């Protein structure tokens, strides 16, 4: 297989984005646009990738250094384009960093949805020292370089929109910005570029006419899916590509048998915090209601049901579990697990380290963080469990909390099996509630309690008969 080097154009400012963030670092599906393109390079098993930076170069280069999640073993290098004098000028900056043999593929850092199969077909079209262009036909080609063909349909040149005459502007086949070039020819063609055009820039597309003049065959690999070569220049375009990408992911899930209530209201994203790729693994008969967002790696077991507007990140939901609407499950880096047949929510929050056993119930406005709940444990209303180990069949009352933080350090609470915690209790860690014990409602527990006993720690009730409320003083 011919050695493959890749140049990624990532120097643009993206003025229309109206953002301080460089355009190629705007996020699609939770991942910077540039990371999507680096993933394309990885899919081609590139030997070397050269990223051409300019606006926000320091940020862009740092973001690339944190792109390990894209896969691939390529050698990553950076070059600066300062000033920015066109696409040809950008590639001129990159060529000294290339090996000089094989094939060079030029990609755009703001074109995130090009499929690996499309790029492989482009490289194949460029086999045998040909110049290969990725093209597409558009109903409105305004702004794009037109593919000008000669007799027999052979590609003769690319004319940029601003330099095209009326006849050329009527052409609907356009250049995508992606090409595969024989490396040994590239440097010579770049040396012949001029900026004698309407924009006063060095156009990379001018090498097409040079190839024709030099007798090098030019192949155009034309695709029918314009989304694969769509770039991002504005928030509206970014939103359009986001929805297109999410629709494609939803369609793939439905092909596997997942029931999506509305595929237009489904999101699967990378987790920017943990770096986990957006991935959802579903067993049979999984149901997902509208408006759900999944980030990082999520597993849904057989028959799991996810209610409307849930956000689930880096978590495993086991078979038969039901997550009711508006629940937030966030495993971040340590993960979260919901056991078989568990009932979660609505409006529940599971934070990193939440590990729930079979048939656990976590109800509305209950928060669980870094805690394990054994099979059959229940916390149904308005409660907090942090840094706790909860035994089987525990019933944890409404309004109860574990006070796990002393202002400097976290401490654990152990609630053994078959304990009943009354409403509005405070368990001040470190503390252990013995198996089978009961804690009376309203208690503040600061010491370990014995198994099987009743523990009450609250002020004694006083009732005053015939008590009269104070009368309001007259105004005046």
UniProtKB/Swiss-Prot annotation:
Mg(2+) binds at residues 110, 233. It catalyses: alpha-D-glucosamine 1-phosphate + acetyl-CoA = N-acetyl-alpha-D-glucosamine 1-phosphate + CoA + H(+); N-acetyl-alpha-D-glucosamine 1-phosphate + UTP + H(+) = UDP-N-acetyl-alpha-D-glucosamine + diphosphate. The active site is at 381 (proton acceptor). Pfam families: Hexapep (PF00132), NTP_transf_3 (PF12804). Residues 236-256 are annotated as: Linker. UDP-N-acetyl-alpha-D-glucosamine binds at residues 23, 81, 86-87, 108-110, 145, 160, 233, 351, 369, 384, 395. Binds 1 Mg(2+) ion per subunit. This is Bifunctional protein GlmU. Catalyzes the last two sequential reactions in the de novo biosynthetic pathway for UDP-N-acetylglucosamine (UDP-GlcNAc). The C-terminal domain catalyzes the transfer of acetyl group from acetyl coenzyme A to glucosamine-1-phosphate (GlcN-1-P) to produce N-acetylglucosamine-1-phosphate (GlcNAc-1-P), which is converted into UDP-GlcNAc by the transfer of uridine 5-monophosphate (from uridine 5-triphosphate), a reaction catalyzed by the N-terminal domain. It comes from Acidovorax sp. (strain JS42).
